[in-house]
């Protein structure tokens, strides 16, 4: 088990943890370096990030951000079963049933610094007990990946059953079809 975190909006992490979302989009943070973003880690903890504007950028009826304190609750672990770059806005938009982002957010990410976006299909696991990390300066900044300390002992269980997961993966494969560029 890698001890790395993928920084994602808190509301998206929650949707992944409830089984309401099964993919993540990423263009890359400012601090991604010369090579830009890639899903270089195929297994990672979901590291929630907090900013109030995310409430208006998701398609859920009632979105409340938890209070931001000194601790960060790590509640989910993910395995990227598919990771690719999509160069077709039509395909990126067609993935709407698999995520909670507003359509304009997908278009914005797709068009930022050139067309195309990275997407990963995930198998998400709830970890028990939740892992509480103290918020540290090293976790800040516009980058996707953060190194975490060694995780404590924990149990993991998939957030969706195997049959549902297989259906979601088949839908992802159908929607992306031959428009794939594997993410290295």
What is the predicted role of each segment?
Residues 2-184:
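Structured alpha/beta reader/binder surfaces that contact nucleic acids or chromatin modification marks
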């Amino acid at each position: 088990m890698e001890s790395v975190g993928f920084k994602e909006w808190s509301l998206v992490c929650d949707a992944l943890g409830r089984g309401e979302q099964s993919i993540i989009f990423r263009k890359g943070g400012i601090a991604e370096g010369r090579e830009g973003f890639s899903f270089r880690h195929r297994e990672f903890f979901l590291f929630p990030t907090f900013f109030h504007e995310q409430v208006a950028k998701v398609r859920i009826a009632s979105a409340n951000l938890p209070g931001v304190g000194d601790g960060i609750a790590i509640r989910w672990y993910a395995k990227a079963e598919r990771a690719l770059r999509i160069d077709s806005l039509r395909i990126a938009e067609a993935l709407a049933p698999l995520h909670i982002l507003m359509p304009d957010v997908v278009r914005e990410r797709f068009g930022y610094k050139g067309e195309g976006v990275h997407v990963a299909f995930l198998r998400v696991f709830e970890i028990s007990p939740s892992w509480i990390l103290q918020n540290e300066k090293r976790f800040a900044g516009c980058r996707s990946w953060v190194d975490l300390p060694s995780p404590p002992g924990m149990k993991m269980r998939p957030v969706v059953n195997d049959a549902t997961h297989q259906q979601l993966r088949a839908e992802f494969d159908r929607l992306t079809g031959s428009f794939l560029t594997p993410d290295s």
